[in-house]
């Protein structure tokens, strides 16, 4: 695809009668930030001089005494917003230092761009493709609070199994049944698939935004767990796609009076929501992961890439599974990939090699640990850097395991390395093991230190010091 220029953007604004341009960038934890300017004020100076903003008010960015930052546009990301009342053009920006004009080291999009450039500089490959499968839950309502004298959360859904005993639906009509059982939601037709029309509207909005869709369906969980798959993209663009995907899914649900969450584990006793990451390397237009003589049709490069992913997984998960809630999902019994091995077809392995027939271009690996709770730019960049390290050092993964890893005898299971079980553990591992991330200056020490301190201070510690409601069930009467 040809690179877009400022002239292309000005033409688009004129042709589409755009009224506002929405300026978008990503904070360090992974939430899109934005502000809007009138289209009449969006001129060539934006491309030359950038737009200023207060970096001290953005999570993970600057201190107040050096808060001024600058945004420069990425014309390739321009899209018409499907939800705004006024005709609005959304565009992603890169963050820069306003004095040196250097790309900002903590800008997640810049990290993703540097990872792509580093891959090319190694000579191993010139392109990394990523395809994300972001699962989510559709709920009718949500409420939660955390106070000094009480903590609670509650979600509800007309298709939730917990509503089988209610006499009425939410609209006041009689309960008509067809509630999805926990772990029983994979592929049922309506009326079990209660939100199929909403999912179709999500799919329509995604296609209108430029996504090439593959399929949409109800996922395993009760209460409207869903998945909509779309075509892969190059690393930076794929991370852009994840955040645009989440924006469209959430706002389509919002317009329909529903609420969507990409939390890894919103429900106790049912499957969590992952973001399986398919990935492959290419050079000069040719795929590098295929060799029909290798196990599962994998080349040596692919096997060593997997070796890097598995070897660094305990620290890598600090970016691919970066929340406390992530580790409520990575537990046995819910199809979660907790075993740090690879396998063909086997979904109980951390890395799966999908069956792709004899098509070399389709050969890829699927890293099944990641979820959607973090920053896709940092997650994809970290996965690529781990894979590159595996290739450069020829890291051999353990022998593939084609058995059901959940049903292994205890002696065999003990020999299988497991993913860490808490955010605290992976943050500690990141502190010990991150040299592979700083190769080529892709991740800086400053970014990694900021990530570690942010996670400890804002997520790990606040949860550690608060009583959990279930503790009252266990201990109130001690």
From Swiss-Prot:
It holds the Pfam family Gln-synt_N. Its cofactor is Mg(2+). It is found in: Cytoplasm. Keywords: ATP-binding, Cytoplasm, Isopeptide bond, Ligase, Magnesium, Metal-binding, Nucleotide-binding, Phosphoprotein, Ubl conjugation. The modification O-AMP-tyrosine is found at residue 406. It catalyses: L-glutamate + NH4(+) + ATP = L-glutamine + ADP + phosphate + H(+). One of its GO terms (cellular component) is membrane. Oligomer of 12 subunits arranged in the form of two hexagons. This is Glutamine synthetase.
